[in-house]
Regions:
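Active-site pocket-shaping loop/turn-to-helix segments
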Residues: 80, 142-143, 231, 263-265
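A short, well-structured juxtamembrane/interface segment
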Residues: 77-92
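Cofactor-/ligand-binding subdomain signature composed of acidic, glycine-rich
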Residues: 2-3, 23-74, 78
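Short, amphipathic alpha-helical interaction segments embedded in low-complexity terminal/linker regions
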Residues: 246-345
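Gly-rich Lys/Arg/Thr-decorated short loops/hinges at beta-loop-alpha junctions or inter-strand turns
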Residues: 42, 63-71, 131-142, 254, ...
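Intrinsic disorder/low-complexity segments
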Residues: 3-30, 343
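Glycine-rich phosphate-binding loops that contact phosphosugars or nucleotide phosphates
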Residues: 99-241, 246-250
Length: 345
């Protein structure tokens, strides 16, 4: 018998009342929607495994693994668009803007997942990368009826964040036709924010209407229409690229090391020490002592050990510059080209 109190169960979200206006010529007429869905590659029947329910467990595992192999190829085909999106996001964040993901269902959850990982991984403010889902926080665990059909809700959610022209808004939708997402991007564009549309179908309204369209076409799902599968995987991989490469470009890493991670538990404190050891070739005791002198900031500890400057000066240099450890090390070397420093290679 469970020992969890009944109050621990998540509340059941309330249905969203009434259909809202639909953008981009889409309609709420069911016959028309069926016709639209029939044109989407993600809604087609996967002819490789039409007898899914007749396969053994081992065969199902092999079939699913085989089907997933198309995802990296789909993403490789849109690498130029992903790079363009990253550059646009970096430019906005350097201006003091934010990165906002939004979507419905799986797409919304993928954005929230990626956004939630940024603070512990890169030491960012929780408000820098934000994830929105149609229907609000309750929809993370349970679907909210009709929410994705409301383009006005997408607009309202962005308005609640006081979106500005300095922000980057990424709409995520496997079909590329979700009204909630289209309405949000229409509003974002109207105020000058850069808009990026991530879809898993070619020729989607989302990619067409966004400033930058990314169409990772993964094809029919193993389970017909279940876009939490390949489409969801593709969305997660692309969002990984958008956030991670953006953080690299913003100087939140040193080589391929996490130097702005938040040390909020023992595992992360051990990782911080190991990161300092990898970057500077010092022992664990030295790494721990140096980290303590800079309040656990990995980036500052490495700067102290590489350059030999005092802890407070290292912190001041990083906070006074653009935050790039490589740039801070290079600047110190330019000031004191004959100064000896530990071999960090």
């Amino acid at each position: 018998m469970s020992t969890q109190p009944e109050s621990a169960s998540p509340p059941v979200p309330e249905p969203v009342e009434g259909p809202g206006p639909i953008t981009a010529g889409l309609t709420s007429d069911r016959d028309t929607i069926r016709a639209e869905l029939a044109t989407l590659s993600t809604e087609q029947v996967n002819e490789r495994h039409p007898d899914l329910d007749a396969l053994s467990t081992r065969e199902l595992v092999a079939a699913m693994n085989e089907d997933n192999r198309s995802v990296p190829d789909a993403i490789a085909a849109v690498e130029p668009e992903i790079a363009e999106a990253v550059e646009a996001i970096v430019e906005r964040l350097r201006r003091g803007g934010r990165l906002v993901y939004l979507g419905a269902g799986t797409a919304g959850r993928m954005g929230i997942l990626d956004a939630s990982e940024a603070p512990p991984t890169f030491g960012t403010d929780p408000g820098l990368i934000v994830g929105l889902i149609a229907g609000g926080p309750g929809a993370i665990q349970q679907a909210v009826e009709n929410a994705e059909d409301r383009d006005d809700l997408g607009r309202a959610d962005l308005e609640s964040l006081s979106i500005t022209a300095d922000d980057a808004v990424v709409g995520v939708s496997a079909s590329g036709r979700t009204p909630y997402v289209l309405g949000a991007l229409e509003y974002a564009r109207s105020i000058g924010a850069i808009t990026i549309g991530l879809s898993c179908n070619a020729g989607s309204p989302l990619a067409r209407d966004a400033d930058i369209g990314i169409e990772a076409v993964v094809g029919p799902e193993l389970l017909t229409g279940s876009t939490r599968l390949k489409a969801g995987t593709a969305q997660k991989l692309v969002l990984n690229m958008l956030s991670t490469i953006t953080m690299v470009r913003l100087g939140k890493t040193y080589r391929n090391l996490m130097v702005d991670l938040l040390t909020t538990n023992e595992k992360l404190r051990a990782r911080a020490e190991r990161t300092v050891m990898l970057a500077t070739d010092v022992d664990a005791a030295t790494a721990a002592k140096t980290l303590a002198s800079v309040d656990g900031w990995v980036k500052a500890a490495i700067l102290v050990l590489v350059t030999g400057i005092a802890a407070d000066e290292a912190v001041a240099r990083l906070r006074g510059g653009d935050g790039s450890l490589s740039a801070a090390i290079a600047a110190h070397a330019a000031e004191d080209p004959t100064g000896a420093a530990p071999d960090v290679h």
